């Protein structure tokens, strides 16, 4: 199976917020030849713990193996596989774009996607856009028509949807 044919999965790993934990997790991936597509780490609801969201492009069987290996690591509290549970995904992109005489066009695109202009200079705008992965991709496809000086993406972050039948989240 080629790299393009392999699906991209998101795994969430709850870990003790201790020195070396991220290094051991990254080492597990690199030692087995698995490539991490995106990685996001931050303290969570309890500052003694961090949540690591990892995007990996791999076959199902190999992903199952990765999850089992992660579960065995010291300081790993919980591994969540988002493949079979209802999940809310979001991504954040920050970019700095040169606008020339197209500032209003860029702001129109931002308004369509609910993006925010965070900073402006005489020739650049710094923009934040948050949403589902396909929404971010559509936003970036339109922004590609303008000179982008710098771009950074968070990668997917995820939480499991609650089991109640409350209000539906906004569509992607």
Regions found by a protein language model. Name each.
Residues 1-50, 55-172:
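Long, contiguous binding/interaction regions
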């Amino acid at each position: 199976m080629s790299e393009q044919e392999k699906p991209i999965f998101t795994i969430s790993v709850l870990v003790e917020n201790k020195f070396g934990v991220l290094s051991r997790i990254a080492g597990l991936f690199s030692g087995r030849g698995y490539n991490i597509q995106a990685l996001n780490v931050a303290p969570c609801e309890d500052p003694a713990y961090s949540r690591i969201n990892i995007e990996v492009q791999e076959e199902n069987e190999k992903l199952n193996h990765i999850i089992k290996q992660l579960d065995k690591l010291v300081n790993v509290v919980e591994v969540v596989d988002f493949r079979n549970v209802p999940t809310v995904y979001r991504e954040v992109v920050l970019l700095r774009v040169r606008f020339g005489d197209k500032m209003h066009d860029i702001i129109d695109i931002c308004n369509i996607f609910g993006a925010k202009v965070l900073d402006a200079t005489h020739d650049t705008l710094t923009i934040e856009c948050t949403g589902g992965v396909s929404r971010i991709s559509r936003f970036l496809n339109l922004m590609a028509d303008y000179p982008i000086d710098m771009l950074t993406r968070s990668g997917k972050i995820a939480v499991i949807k609650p089991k109640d039948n409350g209000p539906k989240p906004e569509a992607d």
